[in-house]
Structures are given as structure tokens and as C-alpha cells.
């Protein structure tokens, strides 16, 4: 038992010694939309369900993040990512545009594979990441009406699961990704309906190596 504990401590120490921490800034554009689901009964008591997705609106995001990189082998490493960003989400249905502004806190696990030299761009890597994202509602509107949060209004807390796929360059420390965010919580509605926020877009980051 003591030997196993010693091996675990040595392994953890070696990983910490190899680990690297990086900071970065990120911004981008997206096409956020929401998915509506409701259920009820018709006049005959038969269950009726309704599901639709809104049209997308123009979304933006920007913020800062940190990466904790642990090399596994020369060509492959794992990263833990955390950060904070401002985002515009929402959607549009039948002329009613919902714009919601959130402060988001992403937490993702990244897998990075080094491709080697990529012409004049220098060393490049491909990356894939997945993780939850917690958002706190700051404000918003439905056409000209201001959104109200809390009881009788919209839910201020939003949670989604985000997926990123992209490339990273070392000579010019830039990272570009495409992403999809799947809403897990409803931002508003009665107990028989839900409205979940989804998002798809592109993001560009600058890394301070």
C-alpha cells in the first residue's frame, strides 16, 4: 500500500513538473437559437406535444481563459480549461426577437495532438474539447420589452454542454475553433414547457505562451 502511494505521489509530482500554464483571450461570432418544447391535452384529453426551434440571431462572445497543459507524450497532451466570457444568446420566432446577455464560465477538457510543421504557419496542433458552461443572466430584451429575471420572469442561471474542434498555431500563437453549445436548462416558461438556449459559431483566441 505504501509503495502504491509512493508511486502515485511520484507520478503526480512528475506530471506537475511537466505541466504548463497559459493565458489567453477569445472572441467570436455565432448563430444562437432556442428550442421550445411544450405539452398539454386537447379537448378530448389526448396528450399533445409541440417542439420547434427558433430562427438564429447574431451572437457575439468575448473573454479570457486559462489553460493547464499536461504533456502525455511528445505529440499529445491533455488540458484543463477555465475562463469567463460575455455572450449574447437568444433567437427569433414570428417577429419576436429574444436577446439575452450572459456572463459565462466555461470549464472544458481539451485533447491536443501536434501535427508538426505546417508550412509558413510553423508548428500546428489539432484540438478537441468538451465541457459544461455555466451562465449568469445579466440582462436582455424581447423586442422593445426588457427581460425580468427571477420569480415570474426568466431563469437567470443557464447551463449548457459545449463542444469545440479546431487548430492551434505556435509561431503566431492563435487558435481557431468551431463550436456547438447544447442547452441543458430552460431559461423560462411554465411547468409544462421549456426553452433551451443553443449556439453554433466560430471563435478565435490569442494565447500568451
Give names to the regions the model predicted.
Residues 19-21, 71-78, 115-125, 172:
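Short loop/turn motifs that connect adjacent beta-strands in outer-membrane beta-barrel proteins
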Residues 48-53, 80-100:
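Surface-exposed loop and membrane-interface regions of Gram-negative outer-membrane beta-barrel proteins
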Residues 35-44, 91-98, 121, 140-148, ...:
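Outer-membrane beta-barrel translocator domains and adjoining extracellular loop/strand segments
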Residues 19-67, 207-209:
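Short glycine/proline- and aromatic-enriched beta-strand/turn motifs that initiate or cap beta-hairpins
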Residues 1-26, 204:
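Bacterial Sec-dependent N-terminal signal peptides
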Residues 25-31, 60-68, 84, 107-113, ...:
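Residues on the lipid-exposed face of transmembrane beta-strands in outer-membrane beta-barrel proteins
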Residues 22, 33-41, 75-79, 85-87, ...:
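Predominantly the C-terminal beta-signal and adjacent terminal strand-loop region
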Amino acid at each position: 500500500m505504501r509503495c502504491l502511494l509512493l508511486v502515485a505521489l511520484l507520478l503526480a509530482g512528475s506530471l506537475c513538473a511537466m505541466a504548463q500554464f497559459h493565458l489567453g483571450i477569445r472572441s467570436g461570432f455565432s448563430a444562437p437559437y432556442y428550442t421550445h418544447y411544450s405539452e398539454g391535452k386537447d379537448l378530448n384529453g389526448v396528450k399533445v406535444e409541440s417542439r420547434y426551434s427558433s430562427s438564429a440571431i447574431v451572437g457575439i462572445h468575448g473573454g479570457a481563459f486559462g489553460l493547464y497543459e499536461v504533456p502525455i507524450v511528445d505529440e499529445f497532451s491533455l488540458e484543463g480549461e477555465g475562463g469567463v466570457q460575455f455572450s449574447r444568446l437568444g433567437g427569433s420566432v414570428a417577429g419576436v426577437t429574444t436577446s439575452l446577455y450572459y456572463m459565462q464560465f466555461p470549464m472544458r477538457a481539451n485533447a491536443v495532438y501536434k501535427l508538426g510543421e505546417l508550412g509558413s504557419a510553423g508548428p500546428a496542433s489539432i484540438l478537441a474539447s468538451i465541457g459544461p458552461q455555466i451562465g449568469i443572466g445579466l440582462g436582455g430584451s424581447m423586442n422593445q420589452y426588457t427581460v425580468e429575471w427571477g420569480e415570474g420572469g426568466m431563469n437567470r442561471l443557464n447551463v449548457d454542454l459545449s463542444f469545440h474542434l479546431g487548430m492551434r498555431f505556435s509561431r503566431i500563437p492563435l487558435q481557431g475553433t468551431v463550436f456547438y453549445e447544447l442547452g441543458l436548462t430552460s431559461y423560462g416558461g411554465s411547468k409544462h414547457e421549456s426553452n433551451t438556449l443553443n449556439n453554433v459559431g466560430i471563435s478565435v483566441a490569442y494565447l500568451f505562451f
